[in-house]
């Protein structure tokens, strides 16, 4: 994401990209695309792709690869396979079952950059840990913040529910935890330099993490948490800071991006919405309905006779664009849409992954498609069952404690100190 405003104009860059760094991007021979979120692969940045090799992980469905290979030089890298891109640099990619991917970058045989981005390296955790630990300098690049980069705009009877991010838990403790988990001795604030610029999402800036607070409660016994913007000298093991200027973002209206909160659904929109959500087999097992409040009218989609449901209030234009282009996650992360959960504690694990990740990105919606999808990752992920059992255990605990945010925060802190 170099140019543009992802998530239907909701996000902007918090910092300017200096001219020198922009030239470095434009002069690079390779670009790694980790996943499909527009803050990682924004259409307004596509001109940069010309005359470059785009590297992608080996995902089920190959959605991004198939879309881009028509116009760009794309290289699909097999999992856990070294690719030498210069005399002193080689890389490995790892695809996980959430349609995220991680990248290992080896420099001079002694430095490792572990580019985890927004993911968890599901199915590859032990393999990656064992690989990283033998290097001198091990850098962790991972999304760590208070937790705004997901749908947090939840309501209960028109009253906004404070998200977990409102606790503003010290990020330094999270850096310590993840550095220890991944055997890294350096970390850099990463994948968190955005702000909200749409008039209907700017309130979420309260929950974005100021750069200085990334270092709060960080314990240097586990390594070094470096400044966010640096040039690292691999020969001298030293760095210099870049110090980019902060952007002063102009607040944009929803209309600037084609959204009018007064627009109502047309009959064809209702058919498209119903067709889109009825394809998801798993939703029918877990939810009874999804109700859309668009303009001044409600449109209800019945999925089953269950009592669990979701109410969504959002502008028509971006919603219809999202379902027609299979990018519903952009509605969630934009945080201008309002969500209300009925008899269900969270969008995880039964809505978000099945719609946005396995469905939209993996093209797996029916019972049979989901089986093929997970069979693929079972066969192509060395540590699948280790990570699967860990994730399922965490989901059970998180679901039980969702209504007790303080207890959940304390439990998470205790777990990370063990």
Regions found by a protein language model. Give the residues of each.
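Metallo-beta-lactamase
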Residues: 57-111, 216
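Active-site HxH/HxHxD metal-binding segment of metal-dependent hydrolases
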Residues: 17-81
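Mobile, glycine- and charge-enriched loop segments
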Residues: 24-25, 92, 99-169, 250-257, ...
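Active-site environment of divalent metal-dependent phosphoester hydrolases
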Residues: 36-41, 62-65, 81-84, 98-100, ...
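Cap/insert and terminal regions of metallo-dependent hydrolase folds
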Residues: 126-221
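Active-site neighborhood of phospho(di)ester-bond hydrolases with catalytic His/Asp-centered motifs
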Residues: 27-41, 55-59, 114-119, 139-145, ...
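Feature captures hydrophobic
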Residues: 232-418
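Pre-active-site segment of Zn-dependent metallo-hydrolases
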Residues: 1-33, 43-44, 121-136, 311-312
């Amino acid at each position: 994401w170099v140019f543009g405003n992802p998530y239907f104009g909701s996000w902007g860059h918090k910092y300017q990209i200096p001219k020198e760094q922009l030239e470095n991007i434009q002069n690079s021979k390779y670009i790694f695309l980790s996943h499909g979120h527009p803050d990682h692969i924004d259409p307004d940045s596509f001109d940069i792709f010309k005359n470059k090799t785009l590297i992608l992980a080996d995902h089920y469905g190959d959605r991004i690869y198939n879309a881009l290979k028509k116009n760009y030089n794309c290289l699909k890298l097999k999992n856990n396979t070294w690719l030498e891109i210069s005399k002193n640099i080689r890389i490995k990619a790892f695809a996980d079952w959430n349609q995220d991917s991680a990248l290992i970058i080896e420099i001079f045989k002694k430095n490792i950059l572990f580019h985890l981005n927004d993911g968890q390296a599901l199915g590859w955790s032990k393999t990656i840990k064992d690989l990283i630990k033998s290097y001198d300098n091990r850098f962790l690049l991972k999304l760590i913040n208070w937790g705004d980069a997901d749908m947090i705009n939840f309501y209960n009877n028109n009253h906004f529910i404070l998200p977990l991010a409102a606790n503003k838990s010290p990020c330094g403790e999270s850096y310590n935890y993840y550095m220890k988990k991944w055997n890294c001795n350096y970390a850099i604030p990463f994948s968190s330099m955005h702000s909200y610029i749409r008039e209907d999402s700017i309130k979420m800036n309260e929950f974005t993490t100021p750069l200085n607070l990334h270092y709060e409660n960080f314990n240097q016994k586990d390594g070094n948490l470096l400044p966010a913007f640096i040039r690292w000298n691999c020969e001298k093991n030293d760095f210099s800071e870049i110090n980019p200027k902060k952007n002063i973002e102009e607040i944009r209206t929803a209309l600037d991006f084609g959204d009018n909160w007064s627009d109502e659904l047309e009959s064809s929109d209702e058919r498209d919405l119903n067709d889109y959500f009825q394809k998801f087999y798993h939703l029918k097992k877990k939810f009874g309905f999804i109700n859309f409040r668009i303009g001044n009218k409600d449109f209800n989609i019945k999925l089953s006779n269950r009592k669990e449901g979701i109410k969504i209030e959002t502008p028509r234009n971006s919603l219809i664009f999202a379902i027609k282009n299979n990018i519903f996650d952009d509605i969630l992360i934009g945080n201008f849409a309002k969500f209300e959960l009925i008899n269900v504690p969270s969008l995880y694990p039964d809505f978000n992954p099945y719609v946005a990740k396995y469905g939209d990105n993996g093209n797996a919606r029916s019972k049979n498609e989901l089986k093929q999808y997970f069979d693929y990752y079972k066969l192509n992920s060395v540590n699948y069952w280790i990570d699967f059992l860990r994730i399922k255990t965490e989901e059970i605990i998180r679901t039980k404690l969702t209504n007790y945010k303080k207890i959940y925060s304390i439990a998470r802190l205790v777990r990370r100190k063990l």
